[in-house]
């Protein structure tokens, strides 16, 4: 099995699931036990500063309102009360797990409270919940043509507007996702 960690899953236009329709998922883990990822294009309508207030977490000395005004994303349907921060690498985040060169994941509160301060990760995504697959489940969904995959790209992850990520991800494959047939065949 080839690991798809550090890849994007792009929902096929034919994917008939109200949660996953037109989603782009960053795969944080993928091994023989299953897979875990974060949906990166479904804002919850909550800003990071509001989330910090709801959690009674004091923000450090804020140097930019832009970071605290970032949207919290709906990371997936599993454990929606659990927060994840996907962020660019910083040397002082011991509780963050390195996923790839330059990208880390944490559930630690210290990164959340540092957002917007001098210690803030340069780029980040805050998400509630995650998408999870049991052993061989993702492989079956790929065989069923539910998803397309491409290597992850930090520009798409952090610099493209949420509402444009699905379209941009499909264009990275060289076509517009809407040009695909909703019917899949197997030869």
Curated annotation (Swiss-Prot):
Assigned protein family: Belongs to the UPF0301 (AlgH) family.
InterPro entries: AlgH-like
UniProt GO cellular component terms: cytosol
Record's protein name: UPF0301 protein Shewana3_1200
């Amino acid at each position: 099995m080839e690991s798809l960690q550090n890849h994007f899953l792009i929902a096929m236009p034919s994917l008939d699931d109200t949660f996953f329709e037109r989603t782009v998922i960053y795969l944080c883990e993928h091994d023989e036990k299953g897979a875990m990822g974060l949906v990166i294009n479904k804002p919850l309508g909550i800003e990071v500063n509001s989330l910090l207030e709801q959690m009674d977490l004091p923000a450090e000395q804020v140097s930019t309102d832009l970071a605290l005004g970032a949207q919290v994303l709906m990371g997936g349907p599993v454990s929606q009360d659990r927060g994840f921060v996907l962020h660019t690498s910083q040397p002082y985040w011991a509780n963050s797990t390195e996923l790839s060169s330059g990208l880390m994941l944490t559930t630690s509160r210290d990164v959340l409270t540092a957002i917007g301060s001098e210690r803030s990760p340069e780029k980040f995504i805050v998400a509630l919940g995650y998408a999870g697959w049991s052993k061989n489940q993702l492989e079956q969904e790929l065989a069923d043509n539910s998803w397309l995959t491409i290597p992850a790209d930090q520009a798409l992850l952090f610099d493209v507007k949420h509402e444009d990520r699905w379209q941009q991800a499909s264009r990275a494959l060289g076509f517009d996702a809407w040009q695909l047939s909703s019917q899949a065949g197997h030869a």
